[in-house]
Each structure stands twice: as structure tokens, then as C-alpha cells.
Amino acid sequence: MTELIYKIIKPETEVRATLVCVHGMQEHHARYISFARELSKQGIAVLIYDLPGHGEAFKDELGYFADRNGDEVLIQSVDTMVKKLHAEYTHVPHFLFGHSMGSIIVRLYLERNDNFAGVILCGAPNYQPAAGFGQKLAQLLVKMKGPKAKTKLLTALSVGSFSKAVKNAKTPVDWLSYNEENVKQFLNDELCGVPFTDAGNRDLFTMVSHLHHPFTAKNPSLPILFISGEDDPCTGGTLGLVDSISTLQKNGYANIENITFPKMR
């Protein structure tokens, strides 16, 4: 079993809090080093890591998590890293951060463990009714072609609509950011933008379909902050954010805030 690559960025001063950072799809932990360093200046010890199927350790199997139940593999990775960081710093507040697909994983993880001082969900994708169909189609293709095959149709179903959301786009990933340098860095990184395998897309669709899964919050006063760009196609716009927030409220979370940044993706 491949060991997950992780790094803890520690403050030079006393640690005031911890944060586990869960990155998005088709990227890796090194893209969050500058973010972690900024937080460390505020006394926060930040653990960044590569999700299964992402980063240098998985460069020969990018976008593949497991033959079966890859969604569980992703969610379990959060638990592993949370326990690792919390064991090192036992007497400070603990926070959890998830970006894009990472925010999906974090939301599903809350059913198992919501014992945090706060959770930040960045660019959080909304529930998609068609995810159930995508999951069944992907599973059929896995049976036909194997878990590590890649089908363009599944890639189009999972992320194709994002690129279509940007008019006069110069690249297929302009939807990531208005900042052209950010887009260029993503395109020039061999560990970024590699399409998921059919099994990987199956697991992604499974997680999205589970976003509406009801559960009872153990920590209903948990502060949850949604942050996103106004033009981020992942969130589903205002209606998508409302749905994401109301879903958590239905599960018992009563302390949710949202910040939407204008003219940003």
C-alpha cells in the first residue's frame, strides 16, 4: 500500500491551533505550501497531504483510488491525517479545510467526526441529481474495461461543464481562476489536470450523490464557513450554495456562514 505524502508546516512561535488541508481533484499538496506558510505566521500548524490517487507517490496511477469503494479510501485518508496532527498537538483548537472535491470529502467525513473548532469549505461543489446516473454508468464501464481505464464521456460528465461555463476561454481550465498565472501553473504541472480513471470518476460521482445523505450532527454548534468566488462554476451559483448550506442545516448544523467574493472563480 502506497504511503500518503504529507507535510506539517509549523509556526516559528507557539502553536495556537491546527488545520488539516484537503486539496481538490487533479492537484496535489505542494500547491498549498504558500497557503500553509501564511497560516503558520498566525500560529497555526498546517498539515497538507496528497490524497490517494494524487501527487508524486501516485504519479503512475493518477486518478485511481481503489478497485472498489474508492470514496471510502479518500474519506479514510482525512481521518488518518486528522489523527496524526491532533496527536501531535492535543491541547489546541483543531480546524479542517477542504477545497473543491476536498470539500466534498470533508462534508462526508463530518458524519464520522465533527469534533472541530471550525470547518472551512472552499469552492464547495453542490449536489448533482445526475450523479447517481454517472455512478452507475461508471460502474458499468469499470466492469467492462477495468478500473484503470479512462473514458472521455465520464470526464466530460464530471468536469466538462466547468470549461463550458467560461466564454471565450483560452484554455480548457480557465474556469479555475481569473488569474492567468494560476491557470498556467496548473497546465504546466505534470501532476495536475490528469483525468480520473473510470473507477475514480465512479468514486467521485458516489461522493457527490451522498452529499444529500442525512445524518445527525454530533457537534451542532460547529462553526462552518463557506468561501467561494462568485463566478466559480463548481458551486452551482447561488442556488447551489443555498442547497449545500441547507443540507448541512437539515443535518443539525446551526452555525454556518458564507462569504462569496465578487469577480473571482
Predicted regions and their residues:
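Short beta-strand/loop motif that positions the catalytic acidic residue
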Residues: F226-S228
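A short loop-to-beta-strand scaffold at the N-terminal edge of the catalytic core in hydrolase folds
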Residues: M1-K10
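Alpha/beta-hydrolase active-site loop
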Residues: D67-H86
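Conserved alpha/beta-hydrolase
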Residues: H29-L62
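Short beta-strand element of the alpha/beta-hydrolase
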Residues: V15-G24
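Alpha/beta-hydrolase fold nucleophile elbow
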Residues: Y89-S100
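Active-site glycine-rich loops that stabilize anionic/oxyanionic intermediates
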Residues: H23-E27, S100, E230-D231
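Alpha/beta-hydrolase-fold enzymes
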Residues: V106-L191
